[in-house]
């Protein structure tokens, strides 16, 4: 049945992010030699490397499926089944979002002139947490489709990703999608595109990704005509940009690269500009949409390399790969930056979950998500666990969901925090990502004096109907936001609902503390949000702790702005009281700031045990002895129980989940 060994290995070894059965069926019909021959005969002038820029749910993945179908990469049945071919993760399909950047090479015959074109589509994430994925993908592109839903209009992620793509010099093609919906407002959306992005309405292409209207007739010709080809030089030494990587249990680390100059083939040796490590290429080819071994890659192409790399941490996204021996003749590509986590949580096994098994599951998941950082952590309340760093709150949520769905593992997650910079008067700076490490006793002998504490800020972009403007402004003000810009997006139609774009500078911590949920609530679900990092700023930051009988519960500790601590501290003690059962002695629950000042308190009175119940009423001597013994026992019990109140793990889980 499988006579072509290359095709067999491609199917057998392909396990990237839960590949589908449909993908395997499609590979059966692929003749690798035909693909190789057609690509060989396509000049670089006929290459088009492009991406799709869109807000979540505007139809980006559906458009990708339709392009794959029209170019013959997948069958019509696969393209219309709603399987979202380039979204490999189960959580991507369930949430309707793209998390990992994916790519697919398509060979398209232009009926206007009969020429073949090699189209490299890179399907990027839209959410701000995965902005690094987006910017890396854009570096491999020369253009992008700016996709806007006709029923929703221009929204925040569209705006943010437009400016990112524009700043990187990509040629943008404005496209209005879902024009066949009954609620589509095509002309209004066209007016918004014109006023927001200063694009002529004559440039706009109107399509339906679902039904395929105008995809082949107008969109694909526009990709060919408007997006320029790659500008690399074939006879220069090989160099390639590392766009993405993933871990394959058979092959090790697989690299997704954009060949900027030169060419490379199986058996060649390459080296990393960042790690200086050298590798021999075991397999090389294109994604179609799964791995197809073509034996080589050349200038302008986007494809995969299997280098025999064992450790996924050695794959530095944005790295430059060169041929061994030609490093001195090869210019390193600019712009490499290590991915930096901006949201941190404590993670602990839920009740009944084995630590070792969960540790193995977390490390397996991190093999395909190098942006997650891991450190071991111990808690007096929850035991041994981990401190995990993520790109954002959605990233953390997706990681937890993947852990539960793919491995069946349950976690207790502490309140998220962000990195803070502690600047000391001697000029040294320390970054703190764990609330328990935040310095409190700043005047103690031998402790370095603190000059200031800085917290990260972001510029938030929100789009919303103007009827909710007052609610959203109030929300932003309550979250320490500073208004930068308010702009009405003119649609050119007098009877249309006016859309407003707001720009605010807001502390990042305020956003990760359920800001998006509150934004949706005050706008009845109509507001959208995107944001970008704008650096650190001095702020009045303190440490808030929860104490039981004078002992800190380290799992319930946070770093907050001083203006928030009284409200949060009062909520903490009232809520936590619900989960502590009465004891044979008084239990005191307190909230404390900076290891010194108590700002809130709740008391659970002692539960009295009737030790006299079984005694005869006239046995006075015995009664007195038992009462004295009970009193002494309470003293001893209370001494043993300070900081050791028996609280079920479920109580912490419920408290932290609220």
Curated annotation (Swiss-Prot):
It comes from Vanderwaltozyma polyspora (strain ATCC 22028 / DSM 70294 / BCRC 21397 / CBS 2163 / NBRC 10782 / NRRL Y-8283 / UCD 57-17) (Kluyveromyces polysporus). InterPro entries: EF-4, EFG_III/V, EFG_V-like, G_TR_CS, LepA_C_sf, LepA_CTD, LepA_IV, P-loop_NTPase. The gene is GUF1. Promotes mitochondrial protein synthesis. May act as a fidelity factor of the translation reaction, by catalyzing a one-codon backward translocation of tRNAs on improperly translocated ribosomes. Binds to mitochondrial ribosomes in a GTP-dependent manner. Residues 45-231 form the tr-type G domain. Keywords: GTP-binding, Hydrolase, Membrane, Mitochondrion, Mitochondrion inner membrane, Nucleotide-binding, Protein biosynthesis. Its main location: mitochondrion. GTP binds at residues 54-61, 123-127, 177-180. This is Translation factor GUF1, mitochondrial. One of its GO terms (biological process) is translation. SUPFAM superfamilies: EF-G C-terminal domain-like (SSF54980), P-loop containing nucleoside triphosphate hydrolases (SSF52540), Translation proteins (SSF50447). It is found in: Mitochondrion inner membrane. GO terms for cellular component: mitochondrial inner membrane; mitochondrial matrix. Its EC number is 3.6.5.-.
């Amino acid at each position: 049945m499988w006579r072509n060994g290359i095709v067999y290995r491609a199917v057998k070894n392909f396990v990237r992010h839960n590949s589908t059965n449909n993908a395997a069926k499609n590979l059966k019909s692929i003749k690798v030699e035909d693909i190789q021959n057609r690509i060989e005969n396509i000049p670089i002038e006929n290459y088009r490397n492009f991406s799709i820029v869109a807000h979540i749910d505007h139809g980006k993945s559906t458009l990708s499926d339709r392009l794959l179908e029209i170019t013959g990469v997948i069958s019509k049945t696969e393209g219309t089944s709603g399987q979202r071919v380039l979204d490999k993760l189960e959580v991507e399909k369930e949430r309707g979002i793209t998390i990992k950047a994916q790519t697919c090479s398509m060979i398209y015959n232009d009926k206007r002139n009969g020429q073949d074109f090699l189209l490299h589509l890179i399907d990027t994430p839209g959410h701000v947490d995965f902005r690094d994925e987006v910017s890396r993908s854009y570096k491999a592109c020369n253009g992008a489709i700016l996709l806007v839903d006709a029923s929703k209009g221009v929204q925040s992620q569209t705006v943010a990703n437009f400016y990112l793509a524009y700043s990187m010099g990509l040629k943008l093609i404005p496209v209005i999608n879902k024009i066949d919906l009954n609620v589509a407002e095509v002309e209004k959306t066209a007016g918004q595109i014109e006023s927001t992005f200063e694009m002529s309405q004559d440039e706009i292409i109107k399509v339906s990704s679902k039904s395929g209207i105008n995809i082949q007739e107008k969109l694909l010709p526009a990709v060919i005509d408007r997006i320029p080809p790659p500008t690399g030089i074939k006879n220069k030494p090989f160099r390639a940009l590392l766009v993405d990587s993933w871990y394959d249990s058979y092959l090790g680390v697989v690299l997704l690269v954009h060949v900027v100059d030169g060419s490379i083939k199986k058996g060649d040796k390459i080296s990393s500009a960042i790690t200086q490590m050298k590798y021999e290429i075991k397999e090389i080819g294109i994604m179609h949409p799964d791995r197809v071994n073509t034996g080589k890659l050349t200038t302008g192409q986007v494809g995969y390399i299997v280098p025999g790399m064992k450790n996924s941490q050695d794959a530095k996204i944005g790295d430059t790969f060169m041929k061994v021996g030609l490093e001195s003749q090869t210019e390193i590509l600019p712009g490499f930056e290590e991915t930096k986590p901006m949201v941190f949580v404590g993670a602990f096994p839920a009740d009944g979950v084995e630590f070792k098994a969960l540790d193995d599951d977390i490390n397996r998941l991190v093999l395909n998500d190098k942006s997650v950082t891991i450190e071991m952590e111990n808690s007096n309340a929850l035991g041994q666990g981990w401190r995990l760093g993520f790109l954002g709150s959605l990233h953390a949520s997706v990681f937890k969901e993947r852990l539960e769905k793919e491995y069946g593992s349950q976690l207790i997650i502490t309140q998220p925090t962000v990195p803070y910079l502690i600047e000391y008067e001697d000029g040294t700076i320390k970054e703190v990502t764990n609330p328990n490490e935040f310095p409190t006793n700043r005047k103690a002998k031998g402790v370095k004096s603190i000059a200031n504490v800085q917290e990260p800020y972001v510029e938030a972009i929100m789009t919303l109907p103007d009827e909710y403007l007052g609610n959203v402004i109030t929300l932003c003000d309550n979250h320490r936001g500073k208004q930068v810009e308010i702009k009405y997006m003119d649609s050119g139609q007098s009877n249309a609902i006016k859309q407003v774009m707001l720009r605010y500078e807001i502390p990042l911590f305020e956003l990760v503390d359920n800001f998006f949920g509150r934004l949706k609530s005050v706008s009845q679900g109509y507001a959208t949000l995107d944001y970008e990092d704008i650096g650190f700023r001095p702020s009045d930051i303190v440490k808030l702790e929860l104490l039981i009988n004078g002992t800190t519960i380290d799992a319930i500790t946070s770093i907050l702005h001083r203006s928030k601590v009284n409200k949060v501290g009062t909520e903490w003690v009232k809520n936590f009281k619900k989960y502590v059962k009465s004891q044979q002695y008084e239990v005191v629950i307190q909230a404390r700031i900076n290891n010194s000042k108590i700002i809130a308190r709740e008391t659970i009175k002692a539960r009295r045990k009737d030790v006299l119940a079984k005694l005869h009423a006239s046995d006075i001597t015995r009664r007195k002895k038992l009462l004295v013994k009970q009193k002494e026992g309470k003293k001893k019990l209370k001494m043993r129980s300070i900081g050791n109140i028996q609280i079920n793990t479920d109580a912490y889980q419920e408290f932290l989940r609220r």
